[in-house]
Amino acid sequence: MNVVLKPAGQELVLTRDLNAAPARVFAAWTDPRQSSVWWVPKDCTLLSCELDVREGGAWRRRMRVPDGSVVTKHGVYREVSPPDRLVFTYNSEYADGRIDPETLVTITLAELAGGRTRLTLRHSGFWDEASRVSHTGGWTGAMERISDFFPA
C-alpha cells in the first residue's frame, strides 16, 4: 500500500490492489452487509451501518472505539458512479459532543489485469496535521480489512 501525506488542509492518498473486479469492490463499499465486515478500524467494533447509496443520500456508521466510547461517522454521497467512482462527505461526532469539520472522500476503482482492482482513496480537507495523521491510521486499518475481504 502507498501512503501520500501532503501539507495540512490537503489530502491523504492510499492505494491498494485488490483480488476482485471493480464491480465487486464497488459493492463492498455500497452494500451495508459487505461494508460492515471491513469498513471499521481493526481496534473498533461496528455498532450500526446505514447506507443510502445515491447522490444526495446519507451514510452513517456508529462504532465503539478502544476507550469504550461511541463515535459516529456520517456524510452525504456527492457522486455515485458504479463501478469505478464514489465521492462522499465525511464527518465525525464524538461521545463528548465534539464534531469534526466536514471533509471529502473520493474512491476510485481502476481495473487491473487478471480481474483485479486498484483502489485509490483520497481524503481531503483536513484542518490540521493531527487530524490527517489520525485519519491515516483509521483508513490504513480499513484498507487492510478490505484487502482481507478479497483474499488471493
Describe the residue ranges of each PLM region:
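Charge-dense, helix-prone N-terminal extensions
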Residues: 4-9, 49-54, 62-65, 72, ...
